[in-house]
């Protein structure tokens, strides 16, 4: 029997648990799942050094202007305002994670990083795990897609960290089309870890990065972004992987200079939001439709509820399969 929890009465912290029963056996590759871009960037440590992936021009800029430069960088690097717990409670289930070592760090810790450093990785993963323990029918996609300054032993440390924190909650890598809510619930799995490194081939619970493609438009133009998103979905492989639609605009250097004091949210994201949300509303999930949809500042424009509600086309018999 279908859940009595209607799409207009969503409980975002438990939205997967309350999906209609008719959706439980559909592969997760065919569902619409909201995610966040640079998920960890709600916290950026302005006291930290610049990330090792930053070009020399940025390094020089910070060395000359110091804290002022970092404060300006933060306005353009922070793409989220909610922490992991807040994002999860609001319905986010995919996390875009970028990991780095920190130069001259005596503790040799691993950090989330994008331009500047964020929180320690173990703290973020523990925060996500606490939510999963309290919401045992919800699941998350952890996508480790960039690694900076990491040697073999750093990867080994991260793999062990995942084991220690998530243990039997992690679903081993299998054929993606076999993974449904019903399958995961029966086995008490709640975590799918995607790892964009050859290390993934050596560890059963790491899904290879190519099973989570995320085409990047790299544009500040909402119209070009939408054209790119639509073309990417059209070219999506019919089977075999998950798929990310990044509803994200990327600032050029000239854009940053013009809006240097206002930042990403005010200069780009909020202005383009109506056009981007209109595109999301017109989509359908399915083999040749959307799957995971990511955005900056996920609390804006009913983004999360809009993506979740797309799943109800399955109940209405209109799925794009």
Curated annotation (Swiss-Prot):
Its Gene Ontology biological processes?
Answer: lipid catabolic process; signal transduction
Query: What Gene Ontology cellular component terms go with this record?
Result: synapse
Give the Gene Ontology MF terms in alphabetical order.
phosphoric diester hydrolase activity
Keywords on record: Hydrolase, Lipid degradation, Lipid metabolism, Transducer
Q: Which PROSITE patterns match?
A: PIPLC_X_DOMAIN
InterPro entries membership = PI-PLC_domain (IPR051057), PLC-like_Pdiesterase_TIM-brl (IPR017946), PLCXD1/2/3 (IPR042158), PLipase_C_PInositol-sp_X_dom (IPR000909)
Q: Which residues form the PI-PLC X-box domain?
A: 22-197
Active site annotation, chain numbering:
37, 114
Query: Which SMART domains would you find in this protein's record?
Result: PLCXc
Give the protein's recorded name: PI-PLC X domain-containing protein 3
Organism, scientific name: Bos taurus
Coding gene?
Answer: PLCXD3
């Amino acid at each position: 029997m279908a859940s009595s929890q209607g799409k207009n009465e969503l409980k975002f912290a438990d939205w997967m648990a309350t999906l209609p029963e008719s959706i439980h056996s559909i592969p997760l590759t065919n569902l619409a799942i909201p995610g966040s871009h640079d998920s960890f960037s709600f916290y950026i440590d302005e006291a930290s050094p610049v990330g090792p992936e930053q070009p020399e021009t940025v390094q020089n800029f910070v060395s000359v202007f110091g804290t002022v430069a970092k404060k300006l960088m933060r306005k353009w690097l922070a793409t989220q305002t909610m922490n992991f717990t807040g994002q999860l409670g609001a319905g986010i289930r995919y996390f875009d994670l970028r990991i780095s070592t920190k130069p001259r760090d005596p503790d040799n810790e691993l950090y989330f990083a994008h331009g500047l450093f964020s929180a320690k990785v173990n703290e973020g993963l523990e925060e996500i795990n606490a939510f999963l323990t309290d919401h045992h029918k919800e699941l998350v996609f952890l996508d480790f897609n960039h690694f900076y300054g990491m040697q073999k032993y750093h990867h080994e440390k991260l793999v062990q960290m995942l084991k220690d924190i998530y243990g039997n909650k992690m679903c081993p890598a299998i054929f993606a089309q076999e993974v449904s809510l019903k399958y995961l619930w029966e086995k008490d799995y709640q975590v799918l870890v995607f790892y964009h490194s050859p290390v993934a081939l050596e560890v059963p619970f790491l899904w290879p990065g190519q099973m989570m493609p995320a085409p990047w438009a790299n544009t500040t133009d909402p119209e070009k972004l939408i054209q790119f998103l639509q073309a990417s979905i059209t070219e999506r492989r019919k089977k075999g992987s998950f798929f990310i639609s990044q509803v994200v605009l990327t600032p050029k250097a000239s854009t940053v200079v013009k809006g240097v004091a206002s930042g990403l949210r005010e200069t780009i994201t909020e202005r383009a939001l109506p056009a981007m949300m209109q595109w999301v509303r017109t989509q359908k999930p399915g083999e040749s439709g959307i799957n995971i949809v990511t955005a900056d500042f996920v609390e804006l424009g009913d983004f999360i509820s809009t993506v979740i509600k797309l799943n109800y086309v399955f109940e209405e018999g209109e799925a794009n399969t």
